Each structure stands twice: as structure tokens, then as C-alpha cells.
């Protein structure tokens, strides 16, 4: 029985050591010469922000099949600092003040 508990530990240790050897940094400094390399804070400010969509119905729609949509909406509103919330008829989470 000890074999079944010791063998997975040995496999994990060997896998970690193998990944550590593969993740070792290279001797050269190829990043500085790469054309997509961004250097400095000023260059980061020039980059365009990524656009993303906000889906307000995700809390109420996705969790409605397990009947936890109102609880999830209330928890979401509590995390936002509100006093709670509920899902309305359009499946949108509405937070209280």
C-alpha cells in the first residue's frame, strides 16, 4: 500500500524537476531584438486598450438552470458594496442601494 502513496509523489517530483529544467532562462537576450518587444511605461501608454463586452445577464441567465440565480445576483451585488439584489423579469441583475 505504501507503493501506491509513494509512487505518485515520486512522479510529481520528477515532473516538477523536468519542467524546471525546461523553463530555465536562455543565455542570450533575444527579447530586446524582437520587433514586437515593448520597452518602458511610455510605450505601454501608447498601446490601444482591449475592447471587451460587459454581459449584465450572465449572473441571472447562466445560473437560472440550477435555481441559484437570485442568490448569485445578491452575492454579486454584495461584492460590489450594495445591500443585495435580485434578478428581474428580463434576467438582469438589479442591485439595491
UniProtKB/Swiss-Prot annotation:
Keyword Cytoplasm: no
Entry-linked SUPFAM superfamilies: Scorpion toxin-like
Tissue and organ expression note: Constitutively expressed in the anterior midgut and is up-regulated by blood feeding. Not expressed in the fat body or hemocytes.
GO CC field: extracellular space
Residue positions assigned to the propeptide: 24-57
InterPro entries: Defensin_invertebrate/fungal (IPR001542), Scorpion_toxin-like_sf (IPR036574)
Compartmental location: Secreted
Keyword check for Oxidoreductase: no
Superkingdom of origin: Eukaryota
Entry-linked PANTHER family: DEFENSIN
Biological role stated in the UniProt entry: Antibacterial peptide active mostly against Gram-negative bacteria. Its activity is enhanced by lipopolysaccharide.
Name recorded for this polypeptide: Defensin-2
Organism in which the protein naturally occurs: Stomoxys calcitrans
Amino acid at each position: 500500500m505504501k507503493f501506491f502513496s509513494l509512487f505518485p509523489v515520486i512522479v510529481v517530483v520528477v515532473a516538477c524537476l523536468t519542467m524546471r529544467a525546461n523553463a530555465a532562462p536562455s543565455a542570450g537576450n533575444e527579447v530586446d531584438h524582437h520587433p514586437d518587444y515593448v520597452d518602458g511605461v511610455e510605450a505601454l501608454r501608447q498601446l490601444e486598450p482591449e475592447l471587451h463586452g460587459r454581459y449584465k445577464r450572465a449572473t441571472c441567465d447562466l445560473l437560472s438552470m440550477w435555481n441559484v440565480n437570485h442568490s448569485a445576483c445578491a452575492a454579486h451585488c454584495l461584492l460590489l458594496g450594495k445591500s443585495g439584489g435580485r434578478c428581474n423579469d428580463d434576467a438582469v441583475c438589479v442591485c439595491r442601494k
